[in-house]
Amino acid sequence: MKKAPRRTAERILGVTLELFNRFGEPNVSTTLISSELNISPGNLYYHFPAKDELVNALFTRYEDALNELLSAAPGVHDVEDAWFFMHTLFELVWQYRFLYRDLNDLLSKNRRLEAQIKDGLLHKTTAFRTVLDSLEHEGVLAITVSEREATATHMVVMLTWWLSYEYVRNPRHALEPESAQASLLRGAKHVLSLISPFAAGDNKAHLQALLAAY
């Protein structure tokens, strides 16, 4: 039995995400999207009357996935948990990499996204602070409250701008699918290395060994 075709709106969002990630949102027109889908511009307009609505719909999906992931922050109890949490975050960033690649451009023309991005930064900062609180409570880190505040902010900054850094380093290939694994590992490693100075006892050697493995 043939599978029922995905609803048109779902197909539109899937193809739009691929195109945005590949070419960057500013370089993708609704004409290109409808052509790639082999549907009429009118059909695309029926589902999403403006390109901003496509961006907002994709951001909502990203936000839902991000919120679910960040809700796991209280469960980070050791170095391995922290590595897995960080790597999973970077996988999500990669999946919606156009948001990070074109962040300044998107913010300059989409007021709704502007507010949502701000909320997202606060949510990430809170989640990272929760991770640091948990690791301090478990004795993995020896870190003060003020150090946790600063480190959580540094982690969010690095997570948010890592792909931009990768893109500047290698603009022709950094955001291509074949570069994903290496980029994600580098990003997760560098963010996690921010907690290394605070690692307590044997946890420092454990963390250094984990970072060296990647």
Model regions and ranges:
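C-terminal peripheral helix-coil segments that are non-catalytic and often amphipathic
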Residues: 2, 164-214
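Helix-turn-helix
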Residues: 11, 19-53, 57
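Amphipathic alpha-helical packing segments from all-alpha helical-bundle domains
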Residues: 112-138, 149-164, 182-194
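Hydrophobic alpha-helical connector segments
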Residues: 71-98, 152
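Amphipathic alpha-helical segments used for helix-helix packing
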Residues: 93-115, 129-133
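N-terminal positioning helix adjacent to the helix-turn-helix/winged-helix DNA-binding module
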Residues: 8-15, 151
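Short, basic, alpha-helical segments at the C-terminal edge of helix-turn-helix-like DNA-binding modules
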Residues: 60-66
